[in-house]
């Protein structure tokens, strides 16, 4: 083949190789010496999907495969949006605290903030913060209420008229999503993003199957595609995974902005939140 390429008009060479055939390194080197462009189709790697890119890592040329390939500048813009949003959100969190803290102390003595270990990007644990909307024994009572869970298989927990929610103030801050505001601190720290996927608890994470884990291929978010798609009506965890996967595969700055605007609408109309 080298002799033919050497003596004939050849612009490019495309190698379509079955799995059992080794890459023809010598011919490719010869083509490189002659300045002829080469392409190699690797059948085994094609099964990994379309999101593949050749890049240099630590001096080695590698083929990287991911659920979504994004550029460095896109990640930078997303992080800058998170920082800006996190700063503004933390200011509002302080203002909200001034108003709800006294009521919380009267209705349910205890800390105003609630913290819990959640699983972040690629399974990295982090501590998430919220305004406490439930009574102090909420986690203990959760085990007793699992049979009333609306989500199948216990991969998430959601129930109608949850008795653990503090009467009055608890229902109000959950209905208006004010309980989520302390997460702006998580966003500022880099544990979370403005838009992403819901971070699971450790016990939920332990029950994940292989395809569930892809939800955490990105940073978890304060809001996301699932949250703005009528989350109160969704009771099948596989549907949650499908929406999260769709978001990750189609991610763009424009999609984030669209979800943020839709989130504002959902919060002010109260749709989708319970």
Sequence positions of predicted segments:
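Short, well-ordered beta-strand elements within core beta-sheets of diverse protein domains
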Residues: 89, 168-176, 245-249
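Compositionally biased, charge-rich terminal segments
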Residues: 69, 238-253, 274
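A short, structured surface patch at a secondary-structure boundary
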Residues: 155-219, 259-267
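Short, glycine-rich, amphipathic interfacial segments at transmembrane boundaries or analogous
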Residues: 45-46, 51-55, 113-164, 223-244
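Hydrophobic alpha-helical segments characteristic of transmembrane helices
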Residues: 35, 41-44, 179-187, 228-234
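A hydrophobic, helix-centered structural microdomain
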Residues: 74-141, 186, 253, 258-274
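N-terminal hydrophobic signal-anchor/signal peptide
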Residues: 1-94, 274
